[in-house]
């Protein structure tokens, strides 16, 4: 029983440190890039793309947890991240970080130069976000830009380069970047008390809760509007550089309501459930949505 307990403890801390389940979003993004590109399905390339980008994403998460070791232990929404770093030790955490980077870049190099370039850019963005001499996560505007906007932009661009060496569809980029930026603002709004206590001045703490929620809502509106035009474009406009999705994908819009309601209620302090449990529920929910989308595509 002690052995099983140790295995469970190891796995739990490993998952908390690397946030592997958060990489499920990479599957959704690569499927979107594949469909919009109109390319022939290539499971080998898609698999390598998801694996390599997930290694880089987890490397960014690991380094962020390492950099936030002292501050996270005072945040009940993130204290398990600092516990994970302590469990493995700071030295081993950095070693694991390097291993993930090397593996990500190695697998990425087997696809093409453009994909590898996007991976490197993504890592640099994540590094600057958390690095103690830059700490863009504690800077106004730069926190959202490097913590959300650019990260999803380069995730999508990287996957797009698997299928096409060209500019990605504009509407898809706008939809993804707006949604990620909006979600990031709400996610950080939940941490406002801790950020304020640490006297951190970033986009969240210098603005009021009402302002953050208003801007986030506007970004969600832009994202949904872009998605609607992506669907309508396939039948009514036929503008290639905008991107096209099946018209019947419009039914997916109401499915975004439950997770949006949860994150908004959390930001308004109406839900007391810890973020880590909401993440687990979100993982299960979006995995189910991806299965539904895949069934529609085939």
Regions found by a protein language model. Give the residues of each.
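Solvent-exposed interhelical
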Residues: 54-107, 177-227
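Short, Lys/Arg-rich, polar N-terminal cytosolic tail immediately upstream
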Residues: 1-15
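Extended hydrophobic alpha-helices typical of membrane-associated regions
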Residues: 236-298
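Membrane-embedded alpha-helical segments that form the functional core of polytopic membrane enzymes
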Residues: 28-67, 115-128, 166-186
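Intramembrane alpha-helical segments
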Residues: 10-12, 82-165
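Small-residue-rich segments of transmembrane alpha-helices in multi-pass membrane proteins
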Residues: 28-33, 144-160, 204-209, 278-292
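Helix-coil boundary and interhelical linker segments in multi-pass alpha-helical membrane proteins
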Residues: 33-51, 104-117, 154-174, 228-246, ...
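C-terminal ends of transmembrane helices
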Residues: 61, 70, 126-137, 263-269
């Amino acid at each position: 029983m002690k052995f099983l307990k140790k295995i469970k403890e190891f796995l739990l801390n490993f998952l908390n440190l690397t946030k592997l389940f958060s990489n499920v979003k990479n599957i959704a993004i690569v499927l979107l890039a594949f469909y919009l590109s109109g390319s022939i399905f290539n499971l080998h390339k898609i698999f390598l793309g998801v694996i390599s980008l997930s290694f880089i994403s987890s490397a960014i998460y690991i380094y962020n947890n390492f950099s936030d070791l002292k501050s996270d232990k005072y945040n009940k929404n993130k204290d398990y991240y600092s516990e994970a770093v302590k469990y493995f030790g700071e030295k081993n955490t950095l070693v694991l970080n390097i291993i993930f980077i090397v593996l990500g870049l190695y697998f990425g190099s087997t696809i093409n130069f453009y994909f590898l370039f996007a991976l490197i850019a993504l890592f640099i963005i994540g590094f600057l976000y958390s690095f103690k001499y830059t700490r863009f996560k504690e800077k106004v505007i730069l926190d959202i830009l490097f913590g959300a906007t650019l990260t999803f932009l380069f995730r999508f661009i990287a996957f797009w380069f698997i299928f096409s060496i060209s500019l990605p569809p504009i509407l898809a980029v706008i939809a993804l970047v707006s949604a990620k930026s909006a979600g990031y603002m709400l996610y950080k709004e939940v941490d406002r008390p801790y950020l304020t206590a640490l006297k951190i001045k970033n986009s969240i703490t210098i603005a009021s809760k009402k302002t953050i929620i208003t801007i986030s809502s506007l970004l969600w509106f832009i994202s949904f509007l872009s998605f609607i035009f992506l669907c309508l474009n396939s039948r009514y406009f036929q503008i290639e550089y905008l991107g096209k999705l099946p018209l019947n994908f419009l039914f997916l819009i109401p499915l975004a309501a439950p997770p949006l309601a949860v994150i908004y209620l959390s930001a308004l302090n109406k839900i007391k459930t810890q973020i880590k449990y909401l993440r687990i529920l979100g993982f299960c929910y979006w995995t189910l949505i991806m299965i539904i989308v895949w069934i529609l595509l085939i």
